[in-house]
Structures are given as C-alpha cells and as structure tokens.
Swiss-Prot record:
GO molecular function: ATP binding; formate-tetrahydrofolate ligase activity
This protein's name: Formate--tetrahydrofolate ligase
Record organism: Lawsonia intracellularis (strain PHE/MN1-00)
Record key words, sorted: ATP-binding, Ligase, Nucleotide-binding, One-carbon metabolism
CDD domains: FTHFS
NCBIfam families associated with the record: PRK13507.1
Catalytic activity: (6S)-5,6,7,8-tetrahydrofolate + formate + ATP = (6R)-10-formyltetrahydrofolate + ADP + phosphate
Gene Ontology terms describing biological process: tetrahydrofolate interconversion
Length: 591
C-alpha cells in the first residue's frame, strides 16, 4: 500500500486499494467456503449461506474468540472498528487464519459526524462506498419489515373505527382487536438521524375522512434501534428469527393486553422481508482479510453487537475470530457479556480494550473535543497529568472486564501527536492492575503496525479463563438493573420513575422474567447517565425514567437519563463534504 494516511483521506486510500481487491469467490476460498456457499453481490461483496456452512462444519472445533471494546469514548470515537480490522491484519501477518465481524454502518452517522465505521487509514474494509451506502440492503430490509408492522397496525385501527364487528368479519374474517391509540409503544423507523421526527402526528385527515388513516401521535426511531434489528443480531437461525418476530409487541388493547405482530397477522410477511438479510455479508480488509458484516444495532440505544450467526461462522472458519461491541465496556461489552454470549452459548478468550491518549486527556480534564472543529491544543501538546488522571476511566473498564473472567488486553491506538512519556504512563498504570498492554499503529501501517497487539492477543487467548455472567437471570429484573448500575457503571444507587416501577412490576408479574434479558439504554459518553460527567464519576445515581419491552427479542429495556432512540443531525454534518466525481462515478468524502 503506497498511500500514507498522513497524506491521503480514507476514501482515497480505499479507492487505491480497491484496484487490487480479491473477488468475493477468491476471498471465500481463502476462508474455506465452497463456491455454492457464496451469494455474490457484484464481484467483491457477497452473502454467505450460513445454514450450509454451519451444517458442513458442525463437527469442527471453534477458533479463538476475541471481543474488541473500548474505554468511554469522546464524541469522535476512539477507533474500535479500525482496531478490529487492524488486529485481524496483524494476526494474518503472524500466520494466523483470522476473520472479523463488524456491524453494518447506519446512514445516520455516515451522513452525520461519526463516519461510516469502516475503519480508517490502512486498517479499513472495502469496497468503502458500497459498504457505507446501503451495502446489500439489510438495513433497508429491517426498515421494511418494521414499518410493515406499523402499516398493519394503523390500517387495522382505521378499519375497526369504520366498521362494525359483523362487517369486519364479513369483509375479511377479521376480529376486533380494540387497539388503544394512547398505548402504542412502537413507532416508525428510518436510517437517518432526524430530530424533527421524534414526535409527530399522523393521519391528520383521518378525523373527517374514513379513508385517510387514523389520527394519533406517533414517532420515528433510527432503524438500527428497531427490535427487528435486535432479533437479527441474536437469532440462531431463520426458525428462531421467525418465532421471535411473531412475539413483537406493537400496541396494547383498551384492557391493557399486548397486541403482537402475530395478532396483526403480519409476522410472516415481516419475516419474508428478511430471508436474504439473515445471511451474513462478506467483504475484505484492504490487506485481503475476510470481514463479516451483519446486523447494525447501536450499543447506547440497542444491543450493540454484530450477529450471533456471523460469529458462529467466523469461529468455525478461522483460528482467530474478532468481533466488535459498540462504544465502551459499560455499554457494548456488558451486553456482549450478559446478552450476546447468553443467547449464543459462546465464550470469549480475550477482550481488547481500545484507548487513546486523546480520550484519556478528555477524562483527565482537557476540553471535550467537538466533531467538526479543530482539536484544542491540549490534545496536540504533551500533558502526562491529563493522561494520568483520565486513566481512572480506563482502569475502571479493565476491572469490569476482569469481572467477566476474561483476560483484558489494552490497545493504545496510537496517534501521531502522542508522546513517549504519555504512552509510558498508560503502560505503567495498566501493568499495575495486571493488564496486558500493546501500542498499535495499524491506522498508519496496517497489519505491520498491529504486530504487538496481535502477539498480546495470542498470549491472552492461551491464558486460563473462567467466564461468568454478571448476574443470575433468575434474579428479579429490578435487582439485575441495579447490579449493572453498581458493578459496571459505578453508581451509588438507582432511582426509578413511577412509570418505570409500574412497568417493571407488570413485566415481572406477567412474564417468566428469568427468560428476559436486560438491555440498558444509556449515554455512551459517560459511565453515568449524564454525558457531561467524565472520568469515573462519584456520588451519583442512575435515573431510569422508562421501561420498554421487546417481546420478540426477549429484552427488558430500561431507559436512563435523557437519551432518545432517534439521534439528531448536528450543525456540521459529513454529508456537506460527500460528493460524486461525475466523470468516474466514484464517491468522494466518505470517512
């Protein structure tokens, strides 16, 4: 690779690398896939027939399983996807057959401030444009499946308003569901960040006209927070997916009984939208390593994991399979540990905690970096004091990973502005708490820059481990929420709103709660529920304002703080810098 990320943008590096891509069939052959197990999407992307592969390799042993997580990030992100790809490249340089699993990027962040989550520099996945803009259509399928349930609901409400019970039955053998228009937890979804759609009124002419819908309050969430996406991430196979889809609660009737997609007779059609999407996607790093891309839930407002199916494939096909959890240990790794591994039955061999000097300085008192603006001078000048104070956040996360019984490996994702003294301080503090540390320069040098990290991960995978969940699922839901708050976030207490307590008690009484997971919704920018609180906040309480219930996924979803399921678009979004070269048809400006 001749282009240096010091001199060229990510999209320029990607376009240069794409001239030498392996075809998806050659990529699959290197991975051990049969020709017929790949469904091509063009020459360089494809889907993998997971059912055929897992059946063929049923008796094969699994490879080593590594999760990549991070400290509490800045709004800029600390390079987890870049590190995931760089680690796979480094492992390949060490002669290990390796693969990665990452999430499909959402159009919201891609067109917003965070970018496409394709990695960066010399550790990114290609083809970049296709990966970043729609890919193989999985998120579109999720949107269609989800929104179809809302079409079924709103049209049913209109017909029940317009017709008597006898007429409903005569027209289509339809029984009245008696839907309560004030108790509809589900909304619509789209794959962009749009604060104007958080609260809307639909069916405005439905009051006076019988054919214009049903007038009521509604809302949009971002598509990756959809329960359909959550089910895609945790389903073992299509049968499991189909069963879960039928249990999604769309609304409640006027007696408070749940109305599901099965009640609306839309669950089969929703599944039909997803029959291709359930097969994981396969692309490559710029050095030719296989990258599975499947599912795309955020970690702050959803489960934050790539799919169980993709990980099962990677473990059967690779000696080392690296998966990624969204945001920090408190958000993404906690859900990997206590939800994804519970559903999959898989246990990790190591956890990589990505940190940067930049993030440690932000936790140590430096001004918070703002996307789209120049970094304050505190981030480009040496300041070991900021690094040392901010390392409390890193150490907190190291100790959390240790509670899971998995050996942590701290990856210092090196920036060109880091100084030897700052790096030495991080290494010293990590070694004092018994964590392996590796400095990695994969962004600048690709796999060659990740050899120290690869060696540390190989070493950690050979260490004895005793993987244990944080809590017993037989505990009451409230106690499990409190345990996450105390043990993972460091809260002194949990305050539940009256509405949250009411919903928790009802869920506890109406369901076998030992079958339900706890999927927290909380800001990713702090250990607390206040994004302004950096480092390791003390003397604080977690504020649970509401509870959602994902009946199909089997999640109780506590919502803490002021976070919303529909992010907004800021004042300097990246779409302002994305364009097309009309002579070549190439997209430029994606990062």
């Amino acid at each position: 690779m001749s282009l240096s990320p010091l001199n060229y943008a990510d999209w320029e590096i990607a376009q240069a690398a794409e001239k030498h891509m392996k075809t998806v069939y050659d990529l699959g052959k290197d991975l051990g896939l049969d020709h017929k197990e790949i469904f091509p999407y063009g020459h360089y992307m494809g889907k993998v027939d997971y059912k055929s592969v897992l059946s063929r390799l049923e008796q094969s042993s699994d490879g080593k399983y590594i999760d990549v997580t991070a400290i509490t990030p800045t709004p800029l992100g600390e390079g987890k996807s870049t590190t995931t790809i760089g680690l796979v490249q480094g492992l390949a340089k060490r002669g290990k057959r390796s693969s990665a699993a990452i999430r499909q990027p959402s159009g919201g962040p891609t067109m917003g401030v965070k970018g496409s989550a394709a990695g960066g520099g010399l550790s990114q996945c290609i083809p970049l444009t296709q990966y970043s803009l729609g890919f193989t259509g999985d998120i579109n399928a999720v949107m269609n499946a989800h929104n179809l349930s809302m079409v079924a609901l709103t049209s049913r409400m209109q017909h029940e308003r317009n017709y008597s019970d006898e007429k409903l039955y005569a027209l289509s053998n339809m029984k009245r569901l008696d839907i309560d228009p004030t108790n509809i937890p589900m909304g619509w979804v789209m794959d962009f960040c749009c604060q104007s759609l958080r609260n809307i009124i639909i069916g405005i002419d439905g009051v006076s006209g019988k054919s214009d819908g049903y007038m009521m309050r509604s809302h949009f969430d971002i598509a990756v927070s959809s329960e359909v996406m959550a089910i895609l991430a945790i389903a073992k196979d299509l049968k499991d997916f189909r069963q879960r889809i039928s249990k999604i609660i769309v609304a409640y009737d006027k007696q408070g009984k749940a109305i599901t997609t099965a009640d609306l007779e839309v669950d089969g059609a929703m599944t039909a939208w997803m029959v291709e999407a359930i097969n994981p996607n396969l692309i490559q790093s710029i050095e030719g390593q296989p990258i599975f891309v499947h599912a795309g839930p955020f970690a702050n407002i959803a489960i934050g994991q790539s799919s169980v199916i993709a990980d099962r494939l990677g473990l059967k096909l690779s000696e080392y399979h690296v998966t990624e959890s969204g945001f920090g240990v408190d958000i993404g790794y906690e859900k990997f540990w206590n939800l994804k591994c519970h559903y999959s039955g898989l246990t990790p061999d190591a956890a990589v905690i990505v940190t940067t000097v930049r993030a440690l300085k932000s936790h140590g008192g430096a001004p918070i970096p703002i996307p789209g603006r120049p970094l304050p001078k505190e981030y480009t000048e040496e300041n070991v004091g900021y690094v040392e104070v901010g390392s409390a956040n890193l150490i907190h996360h190291i100790n959390t990973v240790k509670k899971s019984g998995v050996p942590p490996v701290v990856c210092i994702n090196a920036f060109t502005t880091d100084t030897p003294s700052e790096i030495a301080k991080i290494r010293q503090l990590c070694e004092l708490v018994g964590a392996r540390v590796a400095v990695s320069k994969h962004w600048e040098y690709g796999g060659d820059g990740a050899l120290e990290l690869a060696d540390a991960v190989i070493d950690a995978c050979n260490e004895e481990k005793n993987f244990l969940p944080l809590y017993d699922w037989s505990l009451p839901l409230k106690e499990r929420i409190e345990k996450i708050a105390f043990e993972v976030y460091g809260a002194e207490g949990v305050e539940f709103s009256e509405e949250a307590i009411y919903k928790l008690n009802k869920l506890q009484a109406d369901n076998n709660s030992s079958d339900l997971g706890v999927c927290m919704v909380k800001t990713h920018l702090s250990l607390s529920d206040d994004p302004k609180q950096k480092g390791v906040p003390d003397h604080w309480k977690l504020h649970v304002r509401d509870i959602m219930f994902f009946g199909g996924a089997g999640f109780v979803v506590p919502i803490a703080g002021s976070i919303t399921l529909m992010p907004g678009t800021g004042s300097n979004p990246s779409f302002r810098r994305i364009d097309v070269d009309t002579d070549t048809g190439k997209v430029k400006g994606i990062f």
